[in-house]
From Swiss-Prot:
It is found in: Secreted; Extracellular vesicle. Residues 1-19 form the signal peptide. Glycans are attached at residue 156. The keyword Lipid biosynthesis does not apply. CDD domains: SctA-like (cd22935). The keyword Glycoprotein applies. Keywords: Disulfide bond, Glycoprotein, Secreted, Signal. It comes from Dictyostelium discoideum (Social amoeba). It comes from the Eukaryota. This is Secreted protein A. The lineage of its organism: Eukaryota, Amoebozoa, Evosea, Eumycetozoa, Dictyostelia. GO terms for cellular component: extracellular region; lamellar body; post-lysosomal vacuole. Belongs to the Sct family.
């Protein structure tokens, strides 16, 4: 039994560290830029590929959102979205370090609102996760894509989906 628990712990540790390799973080950041519709030059892409930030917060956020969707628990989804805001706060820091300035302030603002629940943005997302505002973009589909891509180690695709969510929120805030 101890061996089984030890093996499980090692697997979990290995699985978490996989998501945090520079290549995977870079893929996520490049995908995020695509989702928000930021054009990256080759220097910016190379810089992002070398970023060594950890993105453990995304793992936690996606687990909570996924579990909340499956169990229809608004509180879990709400907590997951708040955690997602905390995770997204690292994105502008990494972009700034790579000389990317487009939408950085907007991303910071949305991340801050998500992480603190300011202006009811988390409630807006919860309400609109079923179907989002006048553009009829389905945020729940973007969340589910981000989660599925993350689980399958498609960090670029997960980044595109999260970037698309943030892009929709930036557009909705204008």
């Amino acid at each position: 039994m101890r061996l089984l628990i030890t093996l499980f712990a090692i697997f979990a540790l290995f699985n978490c560290s996989l998501a945090n390799t520079a290549t995977n973080v870079g893929e996520f950041l490049i995908g995020f830029a695509q989702g928000v519709e930021i054009t990256l030059n080759s220097n910016s892409q190379a810089c992002l590929s070398g970023v060594t930030s950890t993105f453990d917060e995304f793992q936690t956020a996606f687990q909570l959102i996924d579990s909340g969707f499956k169990s229809k628990s608004i509180n879990q989804v709400k907590t997951g979205i708040t955690d997602l805001g905390l995770a997204i706060q690292q994105v502008p820091v990494d972009y700034d370090a790579c000389g990317i300035t487009q939408f950085v302030e907007e991303i910071e603002e949305i991340a801050s609102k998500l992480s603190s629940g300011v202006d009811g943005i988390v409630d807006v997302i919860l309400k609109e996760a079923v179907e989002i505002w006048e553009h009829k973009n389905d945020l729940s589909a973007d969340f589910k894509t981000a989660i599925a891509d993350w689980k399958s180690s498609n960090y670029n695709g997960s980044g595109v989906a999260v970037g698309s969510i943030i892009g929709d929120l930036i557009q909705g805030a204008k």
